Swiss-Prot record:
This is Minor spike protein H. Probably triggers with protein G the injection of the phage DNA into the host upon conformational changes induced by virus-host receptor interaction. It comes from Bdellovibrio phage phiMH2K (Bacteriophage phiMH2K). One of its GO terms (biological process) is symbiont entry into host cell. It comes from the Viruses. The keyword Aminoacyl-tRNA synthetase does not apply. Keywords: Capsid protein, Host-virus interaction, Viral genome ejection through host cell envelope, Viral penetration into host cytoplasm, Virion, Virus entry into host cell. Belongs to the microviridae H protein family.
């Protein structure tokens, strides 16, 4: 493969790899920002819950006394410990999903190269199929032309063989058989023309 063709074949893979690398860098940065934001939001919500728990805990006796009075009971029964304090939320830190940018770029470049090789192989297979199809078409045309010729030879041989055999086997009353004349003919002897030897 010539160098320009090699560069042209490798260019999409390299460009795809670089794009994947920088794309993964952007994704990682966005994931990190999102994780920081989620952590801050979770911590703020946890702080609000702790404040609410503290308020509930600080007002436990007052709430219990009010509840007892509303129920028509003596407020002094609050000496038992106060109303229960519900549990609140806890802050959680979010983890960012981080991917290896270089791996993404290499993987994309490798996949692009494999795709290029696969396309090239398929193109060659299509060229081979086209060549085979052309050969089969040519063979079919040759066979079509030979079949009538072969049929004609077969018909000729079938129809004229008996006639030829009779001519060869005829006996001339004044001379030898024609088949014997063939055997006696000398290789350098020229046929007769007007009763004279043609030289």
């Amino acid at each position: 493969m010539a160098l320009p063709a090699l560069v042209a074949a490798a260019a999409p893979a390299v460009i795809g790899g670089i794009a994947s690398y920088f794309g993964q860098q952007e994704t990682n940065a966005a994931n990190a920002k999102l994780a920081v934001w989620q952590t801050r939001e979770n911590q703020a919500e946890a702080a609000r819950n702790r404040k609410w728990q503290e308020q509930m805990s600080n007002s436990a006796h007052q709430r219990e006394a009010n509840d007892l009075q509303t129920a028509g009971l003596n407020r002094l029964l609050t000496a038992t410990g106060g109303a229960s304090t519900p549990s609140g939320g806890q802050g959680q830190a979010a983890g960012a999903t981080m991917e290896n940018s270089l791996k993404a770029g290499i993987t994309t470049a490798f996949e692009a190269k494999q795709l290029g090789m696969q396309i090239e192989r398929q193109e060659k297979e299509l060229q081979n199929l086209a060549a085979q199809t052309r050969k089969l078409n040519i063979d079919a045309k040759v066979a079509e032309k030979r079949i009538p010729e072969s049929d004609l030879k077969t018909k000729f041989t079938t129809n004229f063989s008996p006639v030829i055999d009779r001519v060869i086997n005829l006996e001339d009353s004044n001379g030898p058989r024609l088949s014997n004349l063939r055997e006696e003919k000398k290789p350098n002897q020229m046929p007769l023309k007007n009763g004279k030897l043609n030289t």
